[in-house]
């Protein structure tokens, strides 16, 4: 644990909430990790316990003074133990972020409080839309305006932290190129959840393909009829919240390295630039940078957005590097399926490939820089 994080954990409110989250994580999550990793458990009860502890509610009331640091720190507590569950925590926190920022008061009243407390679970279906905005994919959902709402058809290959009684947010495109962001009720008979092929580390995350069979989306389920201004408002939060997945996994990787010191320190010392103190320095710098950015998630300047994208890229690369170093420090022990080092390595790769992935982040930075020099 970094000194800065330990000091926050020991602090006063609102970090009393963080201590409550840590208590839930430490008492309940370790026993679930193996099943989550194998895909035999979707931890719905644990996610609801996180919500009851306040993990999803610190950013539920949108205002100019809102910051995302408590949500990020709560997620990092989860990530110290299980990267898959931290990803689900991000999905849930992001759903709350959407609902907190919509101007659709009926939708907010229907779902926000329940999502913020964990009573209602759900996720985000923005992987395809986020890629489409940067020319990587085409929009997979198509909608047309009808009386009282829209009819949507198409399919999303992966949406996480969902199930038959869950909801999630996503975007469709109309024939005129306009885009609308909305909330999907997975219990709709015209919405079909499809099982995915096995993943490397995320099979317990409630991840499904989602088929829209001319599903009717009423106006009271619309987050924003004009999606792009809304996306610009929530984009920094969407990306910054993912830092929680990175921070906790890095801390745990550092802890693994330190624990190997007694038995393997005499040889591990030759792992140049891959020592615990190297990653402590990286983590502290990254933590400081993310904390500063997370205090102003509604900033829309290009300079701020570039800094957010850069921080997310650095967080993912640091996570993969730290987990890789932890594997090297554990040696053959970490190569056993029973050792957590190999699981943490698999989870770290996910931080590098979840949208926005490392390659997309690099493209985004290149695009921003090209526009700035034009």
Each predicted region: which residue ranges?
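Acidic-glycine-rich active-site phosphate/pyrophosphate-binding loop
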Residues: 65-69, 145, 220-228, 331
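A generic N-terminal leader/anchor concept
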Residues: 1-70
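Glycine-rich phosphate/cofactor-binding loops in nucleotide/flavin-utilizing enzymes
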Residues: 332-374
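C-terminal helix-coil-helix/basic helical segment that borders enzyme active sites and/or dimer interfaces
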Residues: 30-37, 283-316, 324-336
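DPxDG-like acidic metal-binding loop motif
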Residues: 155-188
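Glycine-rich beta->alpha junctions and the first turn(s) of the following alpha-helix
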Residues: 198-284
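Glycine-rich flavin
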Residues: 42-52, 56-153
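Amphipathic alpha-helix face/heptad-repeat signature
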Residues: 14, 21, 243-246, 250, ...
